[in-house]
Amino acid sequence: MKLRPMQDRIIVKRVEEETKTAGGIFIPETAKEKPMEGEVVAVGNGKRTEDGKVLPLDVKVGDKVLFGKYSGTEIKVEGQDFLIMREDDILGVIEK
């Protein structure tokens, strides 16, 4: 199944968090916090202005992004977890 977000929404896949600390201690699932970092896997066409123009999004597929702890709506597609959020929920893009 292919999922295409509408307007200024994007689909993000969270990055996998380390299960072991630098000191070698394993972190159980119940103690982990969900990461606030992910990779953009799909983007909408853009945000529509009041006069009907479409402004393209700044983020693109493949960008690594940071977002707020409670941003987006969690969805599951074919067994994989994703977040759908608006571009405004993105706090920044991680550049290498």
UniProtKB/Swiss-Prot annotation:
Entry's Gene Ontology cellular component terms: cytoplasm
A molecular-function term among this protein's GO annotations: ATP binding
One family name in Pfam for this protein: Cpn10
An individual GO BP term: chaperone cofactor-dependent protein refolding
Keyword Cytoplasm set for record: yes
Key words, A-Z: Chaperone, Cytoplasm
CDD domains in the cross-refs: cpn10
InterPro entries per the UniProt record, alphabetical: Chaperonin_GroES, Chaperonin_GroES_sf, GroES-like_sf
Keyword Metal-binding attached: no
Compartment list: Cytoplasm
Domain of life: Bacteria
Predominant location category: cytoplasm
Subunit details: Heptamer of 7 subunits arranged in a ring. Interacts with the chaperonin GroEL.
Family: Belongs to the GroES chaperonin family.
Role, per record: Together with the chaperonin GroEL, plays an essential role in assisting protein folding. The GroEL-GroES system forms a nano-cage that allows encapsulation of the non-native substrate proteins and provides a physical environment optimized to promote and accelerate protein folding. GroES binds to the apical surface of the GroEL ring, thereby capping the opening of the GroEL channel.
Protein name: Co-chaperonin GroES
Native source organism of the sequence: Geotalea uraniireducens (strain Rf4)
